[in-house]
Curated annotation (Swiss-Prot):
It catalyses: S-ubiquitinyl-[E2 ubiquitin-conjugating enzyme]-L-cysteine + [acceptor protein]-L-lysine = [E2 ubiquitin-conjugating enzyme]-L-cysteine + N(6)-ubiquitinyl-[acceptor protein]-L-lysine. Its EC number is 2.3.2.27. This is RING-H2 finger protein ATL18. The lineage of its organism: Eukaryota, Viridiplantae, Streptophyta, Embryophyta, Tracheophyta. One of its GO terms (molecular function) is transferase activity. The gene is ATL18. The RING-type zinc finger domain mediates binding to an E2 ubiquitin-conjugating enzyme. It is a single-pass membrane protein.
Length: 145
């Protein structure tokens, strides 16, 4: 928007650099809850269970490897669609970056509800504004503004 109003303004350049270098990384950090290790597990928390007699009545097989489930197999249900897979079959699928169930293509992860209260939203916007003003003063001192 600023670039449309002031196409050759240093303020436009400062706003774009600020948004790219500060707002986007801070937004990602806030989205991850401030956890630096959030990318390590990609948010997949599968609960493994042992395949038992209750499931055996259905005589079903793993949709990935097409091998029938047997007693004591390590299996898991995907959280949203509840499809059953061998853990050793579904983990490589998810770790390769697939975000959907290989059977029905529904998203694996349920959207997380926002847990941020109004005070946190206000303080983060205040942080963004103060960083922006500091950045503008810095550019002014360097002679760009």
């Amino acid at each position: 928007m600023i670039s449309m109003l002031f196409p050759r303004s240093p303020l436009c350049t400062a706003a774009i650099v600020f948004y790219t270098c500060v707002c986007i990384p801070l937004g990602r950090l806030k989205k991850n809850g401030g956890d630096a290790d959030a990318h390590d597990d990609d948010g997949y928390n599968l609960v493994g269970v042992m395949f038992g007699d209750k499931e055996k009545e259905e005589e079903i097989c793993c949709p990935i490897c097409l091998v029938e489930f047997e007693a004591e197999d390590a299996v898991t249900h995907l959280p949203r669609c509840a499809h059953l897979f061998h853990i050793n079959c579904i983990e490589p699928w998810l770790l390769r970056g697939h975000l959907t169930c290989p059977l029905c293509r529904s998203f694996v992860l349920a959207p997380t509800p926002p847990t941020q209260n109004v005070n946190n939203a206000h303080s983060s916007s205040t942080l963004y504004l103060s960083i922006f003003f500091f950045f503008c003063i810095f550019l002014h001192l360097l002679g760009y503004l």
